[in-house]
């Protein structure tokens, strides 16, 4: 059965976030559709009380398991035949797949790495894993050197229903949890009723934990992914959002926004004036507004925020003899 394991907490370093923040982060991961959360021993000792759910403890040696009982699974870097232990095997490239033959007796095996698998007949190789290790539960954790980790993880999940290890925003150089969840949701309706509107809260905690900002164009969680500027796109979304949007912005706690910039056209300017409740004036004045928009945006190399557009439109209409009544 397909399971998504999130190992974001494995990347956290000192100083640790508060217990309450970590607990909230775990709860939100479960909310969006993560099945199991992996964490290191030091994190477990810090957080003390784990929220309800299934957890994997990452240990160096099998002896540490006795000191930390009660977990759903344990990840260990030493080979083990125990049913509750996942052995982790690093394969740096496709040539090392031959090593899998040595793990026929493993109950569960995590295959980590294989960055270059996307450059080869990956479907054939994935099928060979299953045939060579018929009694082993395989957990795939592709790394992201070639920018294709999420695609490989998705393919493994869809074709073989296998377990996948990912991290939020792909922070451990592996598949991005949120991208994987959305892709599976759209392709095979995997957990379609999970609540993804909490993603902005999850993103805010992530940014605080790692003292970094998510790129504005990051798929699923970027702040600007639903900002549309180009005229053709604006027209299409205005008529039928499904033309350009695989899912609604509200599905992930966001909203669509029309941005005025150098790629905008007269229709976009008209719709923006209506949206901001400014008078939609003559075509000539709209052309003048658009001309000024393109000059300013080209010079500043960025689109206009609403406040900047209001000032510009007001000034153009004033110069053309129009008047805005508040």
Residue ranges with predicted function:
Residues 17-24, 120-124, 148-151, 175, ...:
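Conserved active-site and cofactor/substrate-binding residues in soluble primary-metabolism enzymes
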Residues 3-5, 55, 60-62, 67-68, ...:
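Active-site pocket-lining/capping segments in soluble small-molecule metabolic enzymes
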């Amino acid at each position: 059965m397909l399971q998504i394991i999130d190992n974001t907490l494995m990347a956290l370093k000192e100083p640790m976030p508060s217990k309450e923040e970590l607990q909230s982060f775990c709860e939100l991961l479960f909310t969006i559709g993560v099945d199991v959360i992996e964490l290191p021993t030091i994190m477990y000792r810090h957080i003390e009380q784990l929220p309800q759910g299934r957890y994997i403890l990452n240990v160096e040696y099998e002896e540490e398991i006795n000191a930390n009982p009660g977990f759903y699974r344990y990840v260990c870097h030493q080979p083990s035949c125990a049913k509750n232990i996942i052995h982790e095997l690093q394969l740096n490239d496709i040539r090392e797949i031959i090593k899998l033959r040595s793990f026929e007796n493993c109950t569960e095996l995590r295959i980590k790495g294989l960055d270059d698998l996307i450059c080869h007949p990956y479907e054939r190789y994935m099928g060979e894993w299953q045939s060579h290790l018929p009694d082993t539960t395989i957990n795939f954790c592709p790394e992201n050197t070639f920018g294709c980790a999420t695609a490989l993880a998705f393919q493994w999940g869809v074709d073989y229903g296998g377990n996948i290890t990912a991290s939020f925003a792909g922070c451990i150089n592996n598949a991005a949890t949120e991208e994987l969840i959305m892709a599976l949701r759209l392709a095979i309706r995997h957990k379609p009723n999970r609540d993804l509107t909490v993603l902005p809260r999850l993103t805010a905690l992530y940014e605080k934990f790692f003292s970094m900002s998510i790129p504005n164009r990051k798929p699923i969680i970027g702040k600007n992914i639903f900002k549309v500027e180009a005229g053709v796109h604006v027209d299409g979304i205005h008529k039928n959002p499904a033309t350009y949007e695989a899912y609604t912005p509200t599905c992930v706690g966001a909203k669509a926004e029309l941005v005025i910039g150098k790629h905008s056209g007269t229709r976009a300017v008209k719709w923006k004036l209506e949206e901001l409740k400014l008078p939609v004036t003559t075509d000539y004045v709209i052309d003048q507004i658009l001309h000024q928009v393109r000059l300013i945006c080209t010079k500043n190399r960025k689109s206009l925020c609403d406040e900047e557009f209001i000032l510009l439109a007001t000034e153009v209409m004033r110069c053309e003899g129009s008047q805005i009544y508040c």
